[in-house]
Each structure stands twice: as C-alpha cells, then as structure tokens.
Amino acid sequence: MSKIFMFDALRAATDEEMAKDPTVCVIGEDVGHYGGSYKVTKDLHSKYGDLRVLDTPIAENSFTGMAIGAAITGLRPIVEGMNMSFLLLAFNQISNNAGMLRYTSGGNFTLPLVIRGPGGVGRQLGAEHSQRLEAYFQAIPGLKIVACSTPYNAKGLLKSAIRDNNPVVFFEHVLLYNLQEEIPQEEYFLPLNKVEFVRKGKDITILTYSRMRHHVIQALPALLKEGYDPEVIDLISLKPLDIDSISISVKKTHKVLIVEECMKTAGIGAELIAQINEYLFDELDAPVVRLSSQDIPTPYNGSLEQATVIQPSQIVDSVKSIITSVKAIIT
C-alpha cells in the first residue's frame, strides 16, 4: 500500500494504461509540457512524446471532435478539459457524435473515449468555471458518467474507463485533487456501473457522490452521537444509476436522503427521486428528501460560494427531521 494524492492516482492510472496500450493517448490544453492544469498528466509528455500527449489550441470543439475521430479509427483518446465547464463549447461533439455514433452506425463503430477533468464548486473560480454539468451530460444517450471521490476509486475507475469501448465522461472535483489515501500497489479495476457502500446502517439511506461524500462523512459523528445509524452510499455511476444496489438499501431503511452539489432543478437528485418513486414507492415510509445546491450562478465571493453548497450541519438536520417525522407518524 502507498499513500498518494488523488491527482497522482489519476496520473498513475493514465501512465499504466499508456504503458500497456500504445493506442492510449491524451489530448487537451496544457496536458503536455505543462503537465495538466492540476498536474494529472505531469511528466507523461517526456515519457511518451508529443503525439501521445498532445497539447492543443484553446478550441474544445476542435480537439474533442478530433478525439472522437481518433476513437472510431482505432485509438483510445483521453480528453482533458482544463475545466469541465469549458466542455460546453464541445457539447455538439459530445452529444451528436460521441453519444450517438455507436448507435447510428448500427454498432459498426466503437468509441473508446474518456472525457475527464476538474469540475464542481470551489477555489473561487467564479460562475462560468464552477458549473455542475453532471445532469447536462446525463441526458445524452450513449454516454456513461462516473464521478470519482477518493484516490482509490479514482485510479480504479479511470483504468476501467480507459478500457471501456464506449464514451465515458469522468468527473473529478476540483477540491479533491489533494485528498490523500493509501491505495494498493498491485493493479486493480473498479466497475463503472456500481455504487460504493461507504457505511452500512439501518435508519436511513443517504445517497451522495463526489465532494458531498466527504460532507456526509463529516456529518456522521454528530449523527452517531445522537444514536442515528445512517447507511451511506456513494453513487459513483451517475449514468447508469445502480438502482439495484440502491433498492437493497431502501428496502432495509425505507427512508432516503439525497445529498448533491448539483443544482436542484433537473439535477442528479431529481432523476434519483423519479427512479426511486417509480421502482420503490411502496418501500418508502416518507417522501425522498434532497439537499442540492441553490439554483443560482456560483458567486465569486468565498463566503457566498460556500453558502450555495450543502454543509454537514444541514445533512444532520435533515436526517433528524426525516427520522423524527416517520416516528411521529408511527406513534
């Protein structure tokens, strides 16, 4: 076991796959000589050369389209968005090409493409660089969507994403790159379509992902001190949602709290609520509750930025409120 930062875990995953497979390449702004905006591709340029770690102009639509073409002609490109918000400029390529080509070609084309990079709220990057685009991409047919949350799952998930023959959008939170964790030195892979049970419990199911996983963990001491026993699930796969694993938990706890950084309107939580109500309505003792970011552009001011995101104290209050309301009905 070795303790490494999350950005190093992502770099190690990329390095290992590039060493094993000469078709794996990295494309994006400053991924080469500079080593990536958060150093995920540091030193890969000197090891693999200009053609496999390709610096591009500031033209997301162009290099994303180039990567899609490379994927259908035999390469396994990894596109790094310097900030995931920039990929709005490549939305046409991602939606009309990456998401659809395997279907519209009748299966004649595979599209082994990873689109990854930093996103989420933090570091006072302002409204345009702090968007939560998970739900935007969730609506595109043909994409798989993953959100890593620890060095361990970041490495295992990225290696699996690189080897997948379908396009994978891989979200990394800007505030988690310096998170440290011990990970195995031997090679490992993690499934792209499964949740992670962070904590087993019996009172309530808390569904979360990315940075909010850590806010939920921060809320646990206060909840445990007062005798609450929550089950915590990191979704990891945002598309497809692992409704089978979620069902196991809901059938045990009968109560659900969703904690997300995505905005409330048409967010990941909204789709979760729809599927839980569709498949598990009879298992619920109370309506599903979601804690989401406010439906406003992210402020630049640090205090205001923080106020738009769900905090551990809000999670504690919501868990207590849900469980208390159910007990009141029962008694």
From Swiss-Prot:
GO molecular function, one term: pyruvate dehydrogenase (acetyl-transferring) activity
GO annotations of cellular component type: chloroplast
EC number(s) from the headed UniProt entry: 1.2.4.1
Cofactor: thiamine diphosphate
Pfam family, one: Transketolase_C
SMART domains the record matches: Transket_pyr
Class of this enzyme: oxidoreductase
Function: The pyruvate dehydrogenase complex catalyzes the overall conversion of pyruvate to acetyl-CoA and CO(2). It contains multiple copies of three enzymatic components: pyruvate dehydrogenase (E1), dihydrolipoamide acetyltransferase (E2) and lipoamide dehydrogenase (E3).
Name of the protein this chain belongs to: Pyruvate dehydrogenase E1 component subunit beta
Organism: Pyropia yezoensis (Susabi-nori)
Gene: pdhB
